[in-house]
Amino acid sequence: FFRENETVYMVMNYLEGATLQDFIITARDLKTQKVFRESTIRSLFDEVLRGLRIVHQHKMLHLDIKPANIFITDDNKAVMIDFGAAREVLSKEGNFIRPMYTPGFAAPEMYRRDSSMGPWTDIYAVGACIYACMQGFPPNEAPQRIDKDRLSLALTKLRGVYSDNLIEVVEWCMALDP
C-alpha cells in the first residue's frame, strides 16, 4: 500500500493459479464428504487473515471478501484480490459510499444504511468463506438469517466432519450482532 494524491494504491505481483471459488466448485462436483480438508481451510485462511490484518492496519476495509476474490496460487498460497470495493474508514460513523455486496458473504450491516461498518464486516465474510469451503455453497443471506437462522443447524450437521473449534470459529465470525 502507498498513498499519493489523496488516493490509496496497492501494487500486486502477477499470480498464477485459480480462485477459491473455482476450487470449491470443483470439489463440490466431486461430491466428497468434505469439500476441503480442515488443515487446508486453516492454512488458507491463516494467510487470508494475515493479509486482512494489513488492510485493517491501513484503516481500510475490503468489503467484498468472497471465494471469487481469494486467489490460490500454484504453490497453494491464498491471496486476497479485487479491492475495487475497498474503502477507507473515514470515521467511526462509517461515512463512505456503501459498496455493492455479494449475497451470502455480506454482513448484516451492509444491507442497512443506518449501520456502521468496520473490521467485523470483513470478518463476517471470512466466516462465510470458511462455511463455503466446508459446505460447498454459500450460507443464506444475512436478512434471511435474521428472519430464520439455519446456520447453527447446518453447522451441526458438520460436527464430526470438522472440529468443534472450526465450527465455533465460523459461528463467531458470522454472528448477526457482533
PLM feature segments, named:
Residues F1:
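Activation-segment/catalytic-loop signature of the eukaryotic protein kinase fold
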Residues N5-T19, F23:
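Conserved short submotifs of the Hanks-type protein kinase catalytic core
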Residues Q21-F36:
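AlphaC helix of the protein kinase catalytic domain
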Residues L44-F45:
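Activation segment signature within eukaryotic-like protein kinase domains
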Residues V48-M60:
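Protein kinase catalytic-loop region centered on the HRD/HxD motif
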Residues N95-M110:
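Conserved activation segment of eukaryotic-like protein kinases, specifically the C-terminal portion
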Residues G160-L176:
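Conserved C-terminal C-lobe helix
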